[in-house]
Structure formats: C-alpha cells, structure tokens
C-alpha cells in the first residue's frame, strides 16, 4: 500500500499499538529548554526515576536569556530561577546542556539542526510549539506539554494518535527576492490560521525544492501557525549536504548507510492525502501581516482589507477586532505605516542566510530616526559566522543593535519587548495580541523586509530598494 512520508515516519516508530488504543511512539531526540522542563524534572525526582536516554536528550537556554549579557543574574528573577534549575537538573540527570557560556548555546530549534542532533527519519519532540521546524529534514517533529516532557524523559516514548495528512504544493519558481517567509505567509494567508488543524503537512513542489535547508526550516517552523501538528519536507541532496560533517551526524560508512535509508523517505507514488492545497510561486510577492494572527496577511503593496469584505461573520469580527488592536484602518497601504521597532531573529529567521539577507539591505544605509532595530543571531555558531563575514559591522554601522543569541523579542518572556502601542516589523512567527509585549503591535515579515522597514521607517517593498 502506498504511504505518505508522514505515514512512513509514524509507522516506523510505533512501539506498541493495542486495538482501539492510541499508539505508543518511540522518540529519537528530546530537546529541552529552561521554561517547560523544571516541573518535568521535579516529577522524575519525586518518583525516583532517571532520564531513560540522557544521550538522546539535549538541553539549551533560550527563551528567558538576556541578549545583552551572559550574566544569569541580569535576566530577571523568574528567568534566573528557571536557568539555575536547568543547570541543576541537567547535572543531576546527566543531560548535555549548552548553557549561557557554551559556544553552542542558542535557540533550541537553531541549535539542534546545526549540531546534527536533528536528522532525517527521526521523531523529535520539545516542550515548544515550534518544534515543527525540524520537519525540514524529513523528521516527524512536534511540540509537547510539560507532562509529556516528563513522560519522554522517563520512558523515551509518547502516546500519539495518527493525524490527517495534507499536501501543500508550491508550483513553479519564486520570483527573485521572494523568501521562504513570504512563501509560508502566503500559504497561511490561503489556508487561514486554522486550515491545517488536525493535519501533518508535507510541503512539496519546485519552489520548495529550490529552498535551502534554512529556508525549509522557516517554512516548517510556521506549519503550526496554520494549526498543523507538524510540517515536513522530504529529504534530498540539499538535506544530506547540510547534515554531512555536523557534530552528531553519522560519519564515514555510517553516513553512507544513513543516506541510503533517508532516500526512501519520500511519499510513494499513488499515496493519498486527506487535503491538498496548491499555490503558484510566481504569484507570491513580499508579505506583511496586518492583523493579530499570521493568516491576516497581504502583499506589501495591497490595501488593508475592509472587514465588510469577509463573507464569514467570524472572520469579519476577527478582522474588526484586529484592526482596532493594531491601530489601522481599512483601505490604507502598509507602505504608509510607520514603525517604531524592528526585530530580526527568532527560531523562524535567525540563521546565517537570514542575517546575510538583512545585511544586504542594511549595507551603506542608516536606521531611520526614531526606530530601534535589533539583530539577534540564533546561536553562538551563527553569531561567530556572521562576525567572521563582517555582518555585525554592517549592522552596527547602519545603527542596528547586534545582540547575543536568544529568543529575544519573539515573545515577552525576557528583557526585549515592545511597549504598549509600539509597532514592530518582526521576523518572528506570531503576531498575536501582546505576543511581543502588552499592547505591542507585531507585523510579520522576512529578514530583508524587516531591514527595509528599519532603514525607511515604514514598510517598504524590497524590490524597490536599490
């Protein structure tokens, strides 16, 4: 029987499945950070249980960390407690930790792939909703809750029901300057923020194959923003070339054997999906969100929609509420909307290619008066590479702030946040009310679009910036 990639991955990891019961899956990799793990480790301690597979468990600090200092005491009391707990727990249970002073420290979904912890064919979980990022490698990766974190630590397994399957095919080639972020925002604009609910999405088509691994990670990172359980891209030569030689990747003959298996991780011809969505890549232009969920998105040169234009009363009410919160009026152009802050970073867009794209726009220009612009690399290795290429100097000379690795302004859990009423062009993944700070107004864009907003002081079409 022909199977989809998701079905192959799921079936290969079923440890036990009793009739009429939820299957028990084996978990190959468990990624841990300071926010969703303390109670899980406390649960192990209370029951006298060890971590079953410490060698398959990897921890880092990211959500709460300061991006201005490596001093743990400068991060606020709750953050300090959570980070100190992670240090204690990892030491006690024998889990490898990339702490604030480790050269590999960074956002968990940046660290995993760049260290070769993430590999095709694996099941990967983390107490974080954007774990879907790792699906870019042809791995089944999804976020879990704290009680599930404890279960995986204790058993290296997890009960999971089978999801429905969705194929999203982006046909043809994207125009120059159109990034994975624009593609995924256009997809969510078409499906809506709940269009993938109950599904695992496989992204395919020429435009997807043309993406680098970093672009594919951006794509899968935001699968959750259309309500999907996970996102997948089938592995290919792009994947294998990225993985080869990384710290935890197989070496020598083991790598060759792994590649032979990874090449089987494709959806079979004739396999059926529950839902199919198709887009034409050449129709996608630079995207900017205007509302308070990622599905409320338009091309940069389009007018903000009138809520009255939505046939669905729920969508109409949502649009009215979003415009009121965002301080916007129907019919205006986003290119006429001034911004206060710019954030280039997050598990969506903080990798070296993202920083190069932003630096290309920033080079020889200056951040507009009254705008604060932050560039936050996703990890120590990304920061080091960017500095080796001189990207930090480009940003600093242009008036951007060059920060230490961390989740930063993606979420209001650390010192980087918006003040009430401030408007931000952000490369992150969520534009919910209050996501970047109480009363803050978030617009999601690509790194190049964020840099363009920084130097012009408003949203701008990068295709017009020479």
From Swiss-Prot:
Q: How is the cofactor bound?
A: Binds 1 [4Fe-4S] cluster per subunit.
Q: Name one GO biological process term.
A: L-leucine biosynthetic process
Where does this protein hold [4Fe-4S] cluster? 347, 407, 410
Name of a matching Pfam family: Aconitase
Which keywords fit this entry according to its UniProt record?
4Fe-4S, Amino-acid biosynthesis, Branched-chain amino acid biosynthesis, Iron, Iron-sulfur, Leucine biosynthesis, Lyase, Metal-binding
What metabolic or biological pathway is this protein involved in? Amino-acid biosynthesis; L-leucine biosynthesis; L-leucine from 3-methyl-2-oxobutanoate: step 2/4
Which InterPro entries does this one have? 3-IsopropMal_deHydase_lsu, Acnase/IPM_dHydase_lsu_aba_1/3, Acoase/IPM_deHydtase_lsu_aba, Aconitase_4Fe-4S_BS, Aconitase_4Fe-4S_dom, IPM_dehydratase_rel_enz, IPMI_cat
Q: Which Gene3D superfamilies match?
A: Aconitase, domain 3 (3.30.499.10)
Q: Per its UniProt entry, which superkingdom is the organism in?
A: Bacteria
Mark the transmembrane ranges. none
Please give the catalytic activity noted in the UniProt record. (2R,3S)-3-isopropylmalate = (2S)-2-isopropylmalate
Q: Does the keyword Cytoplasm apply?
A: no
Co-factor requirement: [4Fe-4S] cluster
Q: What is its EC number?
A: 4.2.1.33
Give one GO term, molecular function aspect.
Answer: 3-isopropylmalate dehydratase activity
Biological role: Catalyzes the isomerization between 2-isopropylmalate and 3-isopropylmalate, via the formation of 2-isopropylmaleate.
Please give the family membership noted in the entry. Belongs to the aconitase/IPM isomerase family. LeuC type 1 subfamily.
On subunit structure and binding partners, the annotation says: Heterodimer of LeuC and LeuD.
- PANTHER family reported in the protein's UniProt record: 3-ISOPROPYLMALATE DEHYDRATASE, HOMOACONITASE, MITOCHONDRIAL-RELATED
- Name of the protein in question: 3-isopropylmalate dehydratase large subunit
- According to its UniProt entry, this protein's organism is Escherichia coli O157:H7
